[in-house]
Regions:
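Non-heme Fe(II)/2-oxoglutarate
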Residues: 1-91
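Catalytic core of non-heme Fe(II) oxygenases with the double-stranded beta-helix
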Residues: 92-163
Length: 163
């Protein structure tokens, strides 16, 4: 089964109530020089020196390390604060809760289980079509996640909440 546009399933919901200023977010992303795009493993070490190395996440999977640009965390920028203000989070967000992920050409996620994540909110900016879909599998075994349940093609107009 494939979900596109305004949709909801067992593990996702497109938050159609929240309209994004996509161009403003793209402009914000482009503000950060390529030198701030660190490989995932290197980025994680900036916040936790004991973070284990993940060999499946190659140097083509990166995250913007905002402090390398102006010394501020992503969460400290007004555009991010304005976005956060649209939600009523039970617990205040911390600096590592807001991330900009980037993928170099040719990067593809391998089938995996996100053990560290309870939920995520995705706001794809580039490419224009929202990129590769998120694929849910039936099982919870890291070595064999089981058959595919469904795919979610991210909305580019509204955040997509996933579990």
């Amino acid at each position: 089964m494939e979900h596109r546009g305004i949709s909801q399933g067992d593990h996702h919901r497109v938050l159609h109530e929240i309209k994004l200023d996509r161009q403003a977010l793209i402009d914000f992303y482009h503000m950060f020089p390529k030198e701030t795009h660190l490989p995932w493993n290197e980025f994680k070490l900036k916040y936790n020196s004991n973070n284990p190395y993940r060999r499946n996440l190659t140097d083509k999977f990166k995250m913007v390390y905002a402090p390398a640009y102006e010394g501020k965390e992503l969460i400290d920028y007004p555009i991010i604060q304005e976005l956060i203000s649209k939600f009523n989070f039970r617990n205040p967000l911390i600096v590592t809760d807001v991330q900009i992920l980037t993928y170099d050409a040719g990067f593809k996620f391998k089938t995996h289980i996100d053990a560290e994540v309870n939920w995520s909110m995705f706001i794809p900016l580039i490419p224009k079509d929202g990129g590769e879909p998120l694929v849910y599998h039936q099982g919870n075994n890291h070595r064999d996640p089981g058959p595919e349940i469904y795919r979610v093609h991210y909305s580019i107009e509204h955040p997509t909440l996933t579990t």
